[in-house]
């Protein structure tokens, strides 16, 4: 009996050691269902573009920062819904502009800078909600390509410091 009790006691102790907390976490899931032929990839729906450190002297000489890609990835485009489209998808951008310049997105931080975005065809984006040209959409995944850069704001005075800007985009399928 003593051997059985000792064995049971040892088993209980050893199980207690194995049950120690070896890590845990929480997984949150979220998303949005939209009424559209395509979904928007998460990395496209909420983007941050970092321009790094830009030379004030270069911007003062009418230079621009290094151009960065700004892509909007459409995913799981449904063939049936795409077949109903006449033109494709148009993208419009909104944001705070500077000095009435609709193609210059204003920045915060009093640096005298503006953000410019160009569509793949080279046309500059307006931040007043005006939609650009329609892009045909195919079944599956599609990427709407833009480039963006920083420049001296029209009528602005450049100052050193950090800046930020926010633009929103909206898709309209036609």
Predicted regions and their residues:
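Mature extracellular/passenger domains of Gram-negative fimbrial/pilin and adhesin proteins
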Residues: 1-3, 17-174
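Bacterial N-terminal signal peptides
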Residues: 6-14
């Amino acid at each position: 009996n003593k051997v059985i009790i000792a064995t049971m006691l040892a088993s209980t102790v050893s199980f207690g050691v194995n049950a120690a907390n070896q890590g845990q976490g929480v997984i949150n899931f979220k998303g949005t269902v939209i009424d559209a032929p395509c979904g928007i990839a998460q990395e496209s729906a909420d983007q941050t573009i970092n321009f790094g450190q830009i030379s004030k002297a270069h911007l003062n000489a009418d230079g621009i920062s290094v151009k960065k890609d700004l892509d909007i990835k459409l995913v799981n485009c449904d063939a049936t819904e795409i077949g109903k489209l006449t033109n494709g998808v148009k993208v419009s951008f909104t944001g705070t502009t500077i000095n009435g310049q609709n193609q210059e997105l204003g920045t915060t931080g009093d640096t005298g800078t503006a953000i410019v975005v160009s569509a793949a065809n080279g046309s500059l984006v307006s931040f007043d909600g005006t939609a650009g040209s329609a892009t045909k959409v195919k079944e599956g995944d599609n990427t709407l390509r833009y480039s963006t850069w920083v420049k001296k704001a029209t009528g602005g005075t450049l100052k050193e410091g950090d800046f930020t800007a926010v633009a929103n985009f909206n898709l309209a399928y036609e």
